[in-house]
Amino acid sequence: MAQQRRGGRRRKVDYIAANHIDYVDYKDVDLLKRFISERGKILPRRVTGTSAKNQRKVANAIKRARIMGLLPFVAED
């Protein structure tokens, strides 16, 4: 009989919790760019691996940065 593969996906690590970041600052554009796609959309939790609490912090910081003009609403072609 053929053997079956048993491969599970590795759980993604919450970047914010792993680096002990308490406050996600909207002015920290380099951090926020980790959580944005090439098209400028906020990446979901299943892609980034963040917890629900930290995902809310990231989403609010990204939205704030967009309003302040630090991040684009849409990607440039």
Curated annotation (Swiss-Prot):
SS bond list: none
GO molecular function, one term: structural constituent of ribosome
Classification via InterPro entries: Ribosomal_bS18, Ribosomal_bS18_CS, Ribosomal_bS18_sf
PROSITE patterns in UniProt: RIBOSOMAL_S18
Gene Ontology CC entries for this record: cytosolic small ribosomal subunit
Gene3D superfamilies in the cross-refs: Ribosomal protein S18
Record bears the keyword Secreted: no
One annotated GO biological process: translation
UniProt keyword terms in alphabetical order: Ribonucleoprotein, Ribosomal protein, RNA-binding, rRNA-binding
Subunit: Part of the 30S ribosomal subunit. Forms a tight heterodimer with protein bS6.
Family per similarity comment: Belongs to the bacterial ribosomal protein bS18 family.
Protein's name according to its UniProt entry: Small ribosomal subunit protein bS18
Organism expressing this protein natively: Lactobacillus helveticus (strain DPC 4571)
Gene: rpsR
